[in-house]
Amino acid sequence: MNLHEYQAKELLASYGLPVQGGILAHNGEEAAAAYDKLGGKFAVVKAQVHAGGRGKAGGVKVVKSREEAKEVAESLIGTNLVTYQTDANGQPVNSVLVCEDMYPVQTELYLGAVVDRSTRRITFMASTEGGVEIEKVAAETPEKIFKVTVDPLVGLQPCQAREVAFQLGLKDKQINEFVKLMTGAYKAFVENDFALFEVNPLAVRENGALACVDGKIGIDSNALYRLPKIAELRDKSQENERELKASEFDLNYVALEGNIGCMVNGAGLAMATMDIIKLKGGQPANFLDVGGGATKDRVVEAFKLILEDKSVQGVLINIFGGIVRCDMIAEAIVAAVKEINVNVPVVVRLEGNNAELGAKILNESGLKLTSADGLNDAAEKIVAAVNA
């Protein structure tokens, strides 16, 4: 689950991090009032969406009057912002953050942290190249990124934060200020189950003080059950409609750009299914894992979800019966096809627990369902049916 910039800044500020002042506005009048309240020579109006690249897409504007703040806010709110991180439809802008005048600054730095799966620990990354995409820095000048891995038994040590401060070229009081900032960020990361933390840029102001000009936070969705206050910050308008609906039924769904819908039990088998569809010349329309403990209701909902995508021209169902019984899946498929007006070819491959009984149920259903003998056969049949 991702947070908006204003939510991330509020959370980080509660842990003692110095953040750029800002006021949230939902319309032009509120933006104009926010400009007056901030009282600077100019302000920055930022569209609040769950996507990077806002500046290049026109979602971040410098304004020099209350009238301009109102005009920019009204031009953004109610529209969809398309960036390099969104699809062609973009993300809806429901509010803007009117931020204080902070420039000129001495320099812009970068500070971020992720859960590093290779070391199974939290790893901080810092760079003197702030204000640009860290991926670009990593690709072109990786030597300018400094990394610190945190031992979970002892936590982030002040000496580690000081070492990063030295590498960033900070001096005197700035070092202690940075140590406080980094240790606060670590505490926030652990206590709120962050998956991603990023401040870009971390500005060194003209007076030498540090300030978080932007804030990006991703929360581990698996931990939301123990983070009720964080869960309340979820903005469902920023999520894919079908992915959101899938989460309500505990289905793992990711929309793709192909035309062959996939329903599979198990993430590994789902990825293998997409691979073989590609190998046979097809394009998967989605990743959909109904899980090892799939129920009849979940399979019906999964089928509905796939067919809601108008680009789907065929469906491949690939089930390995281990925990789940193939006959139960077959009954659910028959129920779903009868309930929904299915006018695309459906190929079903069942293996494992009660697979023969499941195939019998499908064959005796009287519906236009094609059985497959093995994954290779299933992929060939669905690709041929879609291309027919």
From Swiss-Prot:
Pathways involved: Carbohydrate metabolism; tricarboxylic acid cycle; succinate from succinyl-CoA (ligase route): step 1/1
InterPro entries for the chain: ATP-grasp, ATP-grasp_succ-CoA_synth-type, ATP_grasp_subdomain_1, Succ-CoA_synthase_bsu_CS, SUCC_ACL_C, Succ_CoA_ligase-like_bsu, Succinyl-CoA_synth-like
GO biological process: succinyl-CoA metabolic process; tricarboxylic acid cycle
Domain of life: Bacteria
Recorded GO MF terms: ATP binding; magnesium ion binding; succinate-CoA ligase (ADP-forming) activity; succinate-CoA ligase (GDP-forming) activity
The ATP-grasp domain, residue ranges: 9-245
Name the UniProt record assigns to this protein: Succinate--CoA ligase [ADP-forming] subunit beta
GO terms under cellular component: cytosol; succinate-CoA ligase complex
PROSITE patterns according to UniProt: ATP_GRASP, SUCCINYL_COA_LIG_3
Species this protein is from: Neisseria meningitidis serogroup B (strain ATCC BAA-335 / MC58)
Described function: Succinyl-CoA synthetase functions in the citric acid cycle (TCA), coupling the hydrolysis of succinyl-CoA to the synthesis of either ATP or GTP and thus represents the only step of substrate-level phosphorylation in the TCA. The beta subunit provides nucleotide specificity of the enzyme and binds the substrate succinate, while the binding sites for coenzyme A and phosphate are found in the alpha subunit.
Keyword GTP-binding: no
Cofactor annotation comment: Binds 1 Mg(2+) ion per subunit.
Amino acids binding ATP: 46, 53-55, 100, 103, 108
Enzyme Commission designation: 6.2.1.5
First-tier enzyme category under EC: ligase
UniProt gene name: sucC
Annotated Mg(2+) binding sites: 200, 214
Annotated family: Belongs to the succinate/malate CoA ligase beta subunit family.
Names of the cofactor(s): Mg(2+)
